[in-house]
Structures are given as C-alpha cells and as structure tokens.
Amino acid sequence: RIIEPIFEPDFHPSSYGYRPGRSGHHAIGKAELFIRRYRRDWVVDMDLSKCFDTLNHDLIIRQFRQRITDGSVLSLLRQFLESGVMVGFHLEETELGSPQGGVISPLIANVYLDAFDQFMKARGHRIVRYADDILILSGSRAGAENALRVAQSYLEDELKLTVNATKTHIAHSDDGVKFLGVVIHTK
C-alpha cells in the first residue's frame, strides 16, 4: 500500500485489473461503451502467452526506477522478483516473471503493462485491459488490423512478451466479443 499510490493516479483510465475501485464489471462496461456508443465495433482480442511468468526483471526495475529513487526499495523489489519457486523439494531461481500470489505481483504487472497502455493511447488506439486480458477497439477492420500489428510489435519487441497468435483474433461486435466471460454485442 506504500508503493501503489505512487503509480495509481497515472495508470491508463481503461486499465481495470487489480486496481482500487475498479472491477471486471467496470471493464466490461467500458468495452460496451466503446462498441455501442462510439461505434468501435471492430475488436482485437489479444491473448498473451504466460504473461505474468515472462515479465522481464530488468524492465520491471527500469519502470519502477522512473518513480522510485530509494535504492533499498528497488533492491527489495529485485530480491522479491528473484526469490525463486519451489519445484518439488528444491528452490529454483527465477529469471523472469513475478511470483504468483505475491502481494505486490498485481501492481508489478500493472506497472509493466501500463507502458503498453500509454503507448497505445499516444497513438490514438482505444483499449480496455483487465490484467492481461486486452481488447483493442476500432471503427474499421483495417484500423483493427493496424492496431494489432502495432500492439504485437510493441508487446514483443519492447516488453519481451509473447502474443499467442492462435488465440488472438479480430472480430466484429455483431458476431459477439467475449471478454471476461461475457459476450458483448453491438446492441
């Protein structure tokens, strides 16, 4: 709770996962708003492969260092990231990812993925993100295809994440868009 207020005010407004006062219902409502009111009815549904297990430690530290200057806090963060996992009866070092179930892990993921959120916002793309569930909403198929190319390039090249090409797709909301277990239609 000490670190969260440093980042929270500047997170992208369409980021909903693991944030105070926000929920999956809010994320669904925002997606419906973009589709129904603003006619952003071409939707990229992005799937990231093992997102939380593949967060790059150096990039995490770099993003935290932009706001936190206390070296002891950054050192603790690095120790947390590299604390390892139990496999059977022995401890294995972790070179990537954020420990599952860690108290600060959701914040780490949001800080990490906020770079993507802000990148897309700066280019005029409308997104809704709940943790690693990402929708990009566009007014045309060509716009959605462009957004997918831009997003995939940034996620893979800059954030070192993997977009699951077989599970990522573009759909029109007339056909329904599944998001957080709910199917959203144009009307």
What residue spans do the PLM features occupy?
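Active-site and adjacent loop segments of nucleotide-processing enzymes
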Residues: 178, 182-187
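Active-site substrate-recognition loop segments, prototypically the cytochrome P450 B′-helix/B-C loop
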Residues: 1-6, 18
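Conserved polymerase palm-domain catalytic core
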Residues: 10-178
